[in-house]
Amino acid sequence: MARFVVLVLLGLLYLSHLDAVQHSPKVQVYSRHPAENGKPNFLNCYVSGFHPPQIDITLMKNGKKMEAEQTDLSFNRDWTFYLLVHTEFTPTVEDEYSCQVNHTTLSEPKVVKWDRDM
């Protein structure tokens, strides 16, 4: 019985340690197809390698929030998380697209601009 209690306590200690480990998110912004002005496309913001799982991801057009869909939260073998936020868009020369990420590991929101040449 004492061995069981010790194992449970060690398990709880391990689980509490998982929350203490923090990893900053890696942000990638890209389109599904090569960019062509005036041609519909999909804009993706892939955020990976972060912990804890609470995160806010916003796709933006000229600094304003775009309506977007988000995949379910998933995790890697190392218990860091990843998400994909995506939306349809039609690129133009004048418009600037970006992805803004808020996470507890960041002192300020991380903004990554879409590079149409990628």
From Swiss-Prot:
<dbReference type="GO" id="GO:0031902">
    <property type="term" value="C:late endosome membrane"/>
</dbReference>
<dbReference type="InterPro" id="IPR003006">
    <property type="entry name" value="Ig/MHC_CS"/>
</dbReference>
<dbReference type="GO" id="GO:0042605">
    <property type="term" value="F:peptide antigen binding"/>
</dbReference>
<dbReference type="InterPro" id="IPR013783">
    <property type="entry name" value="Ig-like_fold"/>
</dbReference>
<dbReference type="InterPro" id="IPR036179">
    <property type="entry name" value="Ig-like_dom_sf"/>
</dbReference>
<comment type="subunit">
    <text>Heterodimer of an alpha chain and a beta chain. Beta-2-microglobulin is the beta-chain of major histocompatibility complex class I molecules.</text>
</comment>
<dbReference type="Pfam" id="PF07654">
    <property type="entry name" value="C1-set"/>
</dbReference>
<feature type="disulfide bond">
    <location>
        <begin position="45"/>
        <end position="99"/>
    </location>
</feature>
<dbReference type="InterPro" id="IPR003597">
    <property type="entry name" value="Ig_C1-set"/>
</dbReference>
<comment type="similarity">
    <text>Belongs to the beta-2-microglobulin family.</text>
</comment>
<dbReference type="InterPro" id="IPR015707">
    <property type="entry name" value="B2Microglobulin"/>
</dbReference>
<dbReference type="GO" id="GO:0050870">
    <property type="term" value="P:positive regulation of T cell activation"/>
</dbReference>
<dbReference type="InterPro" id="IPR007110">
    <property type="entry name" value="Ig-like_dom"/>
</dbReference>
<dbReference type="GO" id="GO:0002503">
    <property type="term" value="P:peptide antigen assembly with MHC class II protein complex"/>
</dbReference>
<keyword id="KW-1015">Disulfide bond</keyword>
<dbReference type="GO" id="GO:0019886">
    <property type="term" value="P:antigen processing and presentation of exogenous peptide antigen via MHC class II"/>
</dbReference>
<dbReference type="GO" id="GO:0023026">
    <property type="term" value="F:MHC class II protein complex binding"/>
</dbReference>
<dbReference type="GO" id="GO:0006955">
    <property type="term" value="P:immune response"/>
</dbReference>
<dbReference type="GO" id="GO:0050778">
    <property type="term" value="P:positive regulation of immune response"/>
</dbReference>
<feature type="domain" description="Ig-like C1-type">
    <location>
        <begin position="25"/>
        <end position="113"/>
    </location>
</feature>
<dbReference type="GO" id="GO:0002474">
    <property type="term" value="P:antigen processing and presentation of peptide antigen via MHC class I"/>
</dbReference>
<dbReference type="GO" id="GO:0005576">
    <property type="term" value="C:extracellular region"/>
</dbReference>
<dbReference type="GO" id="GO:0042612">
    <property type="term" value="C:MHC class I protein complex"/>
</dbReference>
<feature type="signal peptide">
    <location>
        <begin position="1"/>
        <end position="20"/>
    </location>
</feature>
<comment type="function">
    <text>Component of the class I major histocompatibility complex (MHC). Involved in the presentation of peptide antigens to the immune system.</text>
</comment>
<keyword id="KW-0964">Secreted</keyword>
<keyword id="KW-0391">Immunity</keyword>
<protein>
    <recommendedName>
        <fullName>Beta-2-microglobulin</fullName>
    </recommendedName>
</protein>
<dbReference type="InterPro" id="IPR050160">
    <property type="entry name" value="MHC/Immunoglobulin"/>
</dbReference>
<dbReference type="GO" id="GO:0042613">
    <property type="term" value="C:MHC class II protein complex"/>
</dbReference>
<dbReference type="GO" id="GO:0005765">
    <property type="term" value="C:lysosomal membrane"/>
</dbReference>
<keyword id="KW-0490">MHC I</keyword>
<keyword id="KW-0393">Immunoglobulin domain</keyword>
<keyword id="KW-0732">Signal</keyword>
